Amino acid sequence: MARKTVSRKRKAEEPKEQQFDWCQSAFKRPRVSSSVRHAQHWWQSRRSVVCSVRGREFRPQQQHEWSFQRSLRGFAAGRIPGILREREFSLGRLNKVFASQWLNHRQVVCGTKCNTLFVVDVLSGQITRIPMLKDREGRGEVSQGLGGVGSPFHFHNPGSVGGLDVQQGCGIHAIELNPSRTLLATGGDNPNSLAVYRLPTLDPVCVGDDGHNDWIFSIAWISDTMAVSGSRDGSMGLWEISEDVLSQAEKRQNVEGVPGYSHISHRALKDIPKEYTHPYNCKVRALAFNNSHKELGAVSLDGYFHLWKAEDNLSKELSTKLPYCKENVCLAYGLDWSVYAVGSQAHVSFLDPRQSSQNIKSVSSRERGSGIRSVSFYEHIVTVGTGQGSLLFYDIRAQRFLDGPSSTPGGYRNRTAEGILKLTTGRGWLNHDETWRSYFSDIRSFPNAVYTHCYDDSGTKLFVAGGPLCSGLHGNYAGLWS
């Protein structure tokens, strides 16, 4: 009887199964989750077999909560695009936003063609410019920077070194945050160089200024301290931001009161294969990292996809010819689906490196000729930004684009002839300069190419930015869809 009594008491003490309501936010943590985790940790901290078994009883409930939240996120991901509404931001006279990333729930950092790095507050619309990091003086001098053990540090204060003249038509093409969101990598004052800032303060950390001979087009973090840059010169540079680099930059700021940064050398520099095509067309245009397999995907403008093993070094694994090889300028990796999405002139191709190239699936963007300018994964939805200022949403699970609403309130949401959902960017700003007056003044309006877009952590806000597709036109667009 005693055993039965104890059993009944234990059973009575077991936490009741949590009830969920569909009206709960998909992204709000259930109230009892923290108490469940606390109880599980308490039981697991007791060093006995009974307590260990008792702690395991909480795991199925946690798995149920996780599965439910994941299902709800997936459900919301397929519904939210149809109800998004646009709010434009004024960026002044900046020219074409090429890159963007969310810093937190209200700030987005952006880079432009005119080599400007700035942060926009999506609540107030305020723009804050970030100083660009310059190369060391006399780059022709022999200097190892922080490339090897025991090599000297080289420091500069922002503005203390005369930077290179801004090269026409280049700018900042990439902005990436490391996995812990403590460092930000982007282009430097010299677009051939890699600049690293500390988050959340955006204090300068270092500049990698001896790797590439041409513009940096793409950046990917392969760990918290190592980043890879892809350049128009056909090379990929591996950079390490070590604890020494971080501590020395912080120490200098504490001593002098002015943020300073060091200059580092690449850890490795690899050229992509050039035996397949014309060597002058082997420009690394986009990178995407698969953390599960420690593999780095790269797309070159000659129409090839390259896969590299990326850990402490870069080693090539394979190269594959893409089915659509014109204007391959964007790349994203879908972790849940183990595929890379590659944008081209009129298609998005889905590539699994472990399958034959004959199994590459491609879908048409319905806007031939304008090009796919940006692509991203969120849950099972692939968001596609086009050169005609459109946002399309492809359901990789159902293998079709999301359907558009039958009625379209507002002027920026419409249903295409095929019945798919398409969001169209606003007017933005266009400079009526001499180029516009000479060649384009008879055209009433220009669509703003979606060069960059990014979701916030909740998946309910989509930041979209870009500018006119024509290279000779000067203008910008930025908006928050929520």
From Swiss-Prot:
* Subunit structure comment from the entry: Component of the DCX(DCAF12) E3 ubiquitin ligase complex, at least composed of cul4 (cul4a or cul4b), ddb1, dcaf12 and rbx1.
> What are the UniProt keywords, alphabetically?
Cytoplasm, Cytoskeleton, Nucleus, Repeat, Ubl conjugation pathway, WD repeat
Q: What is this protein called?
A: DDB1- and CUL4-associated factor 12
Q: Which Pfam families match?
A: Beta-prop_DCAF12
Species of origin reads Danio rerio
Which residue ranges traverse the bilayer?
A: none
Localization (cell): Cytoplasm; Cytoplasm, Cytoskeleton, Microtubule organizing center, Centrosome; Nucleus
SMART domains, alphabetically? WD40
Q: What GO cellular-component annotations does this UniProt entry give?
A: centrosome; Cul4-RING E3 ubiquitin ligase complex; cytoplasm; nucleus
Family statement: Belongs to the WD repeat DCAF12 family.
- State which pathway it belongs to: Protein modification; protein ubiquitination
Domain of life of the organism encoding this protein: Eukaryota
The stretches annotated as WD repeats are 167-207, 211-249, 279-318, 367-404
- Tell me, what does this protein do in biology? Substrate-recognition component of a DCX (DDB1-CUL4-X-box) E3 ubiquitin-protein ligase complex of the DesCEND (destruction via C-end degrons) pathway, which recognizes a C-degron located at the extreme C terminus of target proteins, leading to their ubiquitination and degradation. The C-degron recognized by the DesCEND pathway is usually a motif of less than ten residues and can be present in full-length proteins, truncated proteins or proteolytically cleaved forms.
What is one process in the GO biological process aspect for this record? regulation of autophagy
Cross-referenced InterPro entries:
Beta-prop_DCAF12, DCAF12, WD40/YVTN_repeat-like_dom_sf, WD40_repeat_CS, WD40_repeat_dom_sf, WD40_rpt
* A GO term for molecular function: ubiquitin-like ligase-substrate adaptor activity
